[in-house]
From Swiss-Prot:
Belongs to the GroES chaperonin family. It is found in: Cytoplasm. GO terms for biological process: chaperone cofactor-dependent protein refolding. This is Co-chaperonin GroES. It comes from the Bacteria. Together with the chaperonin GroEL, plays an essential role in assisting protein folding. The GroEL-GroES system forms a nano-cage that allows encapsulation of the non-native substrate proteins and provides a physical environment optimized to promote and accelerate protein folding. GroES binds to the apical surface of the GroEL ring, thereby capping the opening of the GroEL channel. GO terms for molecular function: ATP binding; metal ion binding; protein folding chaperone; protein-folding chaperone binding; unfolded protein binding. The gene is groES. Heptamer of 7 subunits arranged in a ring. Interacts with the chaperonin GroEL. The keyword Transcription regulation does not apply. Keywords: Chaperone, Cytoplasm.
Amino acid sequence: MNIRPLHDRVIIKREEVETRSAGGIVLTGSAATKSTRAKVLAVGKGRILENGTVQPLDVKVGDTVIFNDGYGVKSEKIDGEEVLIISENDILAIVE
């Protein structure tokens, strides 16, 4: 993938979610929820502060994160893969 996000943007790939219930039933449609965990594929240079300095991002390529899947999440297909472009503000946690 040849894409570089700008500023405080992060490109992530959503992790696959289990499509079977605990009882073994295959979940489809609205019953199958999308994961809010993702792998970080690329990060921007950082957030530009009011004084003009750039604050580097806390996340780095390869991190697994939990993100807020709401307004402001942009879905794109790049090289045949669906990725999400989000602001670092939409990342809630880094899974360690």
